[in-house]
Amino acid sequence: MEKKRYRPNVAAIVLSSNYPKKVEFFIAARSDVPDSWQFPQGGIDKGESPKEALLRELKEEIGTDKIEIIAEFPEWVSYDFPKKIAKKMYPYDGQTQKYFLVKLKPEAKIDLDTKEPEFNDYKFVPYKDLFHYVTFFKRPVYKKVLEYFKKEGYF
């Protein structure tokens, strides 16, 4: 059996600037997939550290890198693409991700009208509503990572 290939990637669990008073998670709707909400994420370029990729991806996807890194998930987490998406993402079968828990700085301004827009809408939602929006194949990874940060006392 052929070994699966995973694309190295970073993902940001973005909390509003109201954190820790109010715990609200930033999620965005993909412009290319209707009703598909997710956290900002993106590939790690050759020679780039995960933290450098995190800042670059946030700037590219949500128009700001004005964040404070609160914590980092201690391991890399992988998931497989659904068949429909896998064809588009060839040669990769899925992604292996490094997750960061970050807080927007008060001066941060979200702007989805970026050079290559990936999202067409965003909202801040409480934890209890998060999985109502998140696309199905990302839910297990999101649950694992969020449960860890919850257990560690971040929210």
Curated annotation (Swiss-Prot):
The keyword tRNA-binding does not apply. Residues 5-147 form the Nudix hydrolase domain. Keywords: Hydrolase. The gene is rppH. Its EC number is 3.6.1.-. Accelerates the degradation of transcripts by removing pyrophosphate from the 5'-end of triphosphorylated RNA, leading to a more labile monophosphorylated state that can stimulate subsequent ribonuclease cleavage. Signal peptide: none annotated. Its cofactor is a divalent metal cation. The keyword Hydrolase applies. This is RNA pyrophosphohydrolase. Gene3D superfamilies: Nucleoside Triphosphate Pyrophosphohydrolase. Belongs to the Nudix hydrolase family. RppH subfamily. InterPro entries: Nudix_hydrolase, NUDIX_hydrolase-like_dom_sf, NUDIX_hydrolase_CS, NUDIX_hydrolase_dom, RppH.
